[in-house]
Every structure is written in structure tokens, then in C-alpha cells.
């Protein structure tokens, strides 16, 4: 799993700071009430982002990439508790891996549950009290570009900026 994270410049210290855990096994009950279990392998590692009594399981190389367990939080904001009290800029990204990579390289970043999540205005208002610039930095695939435009328009009264990196737009 360390090789997976190293590709994105994410070190062990960053993973610990963000409460990201390696999972050997995950057991739960499906929405149909049937128990199931998943096992982590070298080809299909399994990681967990822990937020209190809620866990988001991430399987980067699997068809079913995300699973959720525990008591879901109302406003899922990954990286919020790691933010400094004040800062110049903060990136709002499309996913946890982006938050981890940016943080490992010295940038402040958060993400919501996905790029298609509606960003709560009260969170934007709170961030503006702490940071001079809020920047949307989503993926450059079709969804990311569409949602960047939608979020910038929805949050226009807050003068949220956006950045599109010159990448191919693939995962």
C-alpha cells in the first residue's frame, strides 16, 4: 500500500495525521440485509478514512471503490480538522486522495463526499473567515469540469475561485 500512496507523494505521516488506516478485512451487512466481507490484497488494497463513528472505505483498484460504515455524518468534510486556524488559500478537491496529496506537499485542502456533492454555504462562510482564497480544484474529466462550473456558479456570491490543471482528464 505504501507504493500506492508514494505515487501521489503521500507519506506515512500524512496518512496518520488524516486518520487513514490500512484494512486487512472489512465486514458489514448489505442493504438487502446479507452479511458480506472483503479482504485486502496486494492487487486490491483497502483503506479507511475514519471520521469519528463513521468510516469511508476506499478500494482504489476495485470496481466497487467506496463503501460506508458506521453512523454517517451530516456534513462530510474530509481534512477539515487538519486545517490551520488561518491561511492564505485552501483547495476544495474532488476526493480524499487529492486532499492527502496536496497536504503532503504543504497545501491546505478539504473535500466533500464527492465532486457532485452540494457544498454547504455555512461551511464556505466559515472557511472565508479563516482563508483569503477558496479554490475549487476538481478532476479534469467530464464530471470534474461540469461540477467545477456548477459549484463556481452556485457559490458566486462568495467569489470562490477555480483552477483547472492541464491534465488529460483520466483517473
Q: Where are each of the predicted segments found?
A:
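A generic structural-conservation signal
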Residues: 14, 24, 111, 162-164
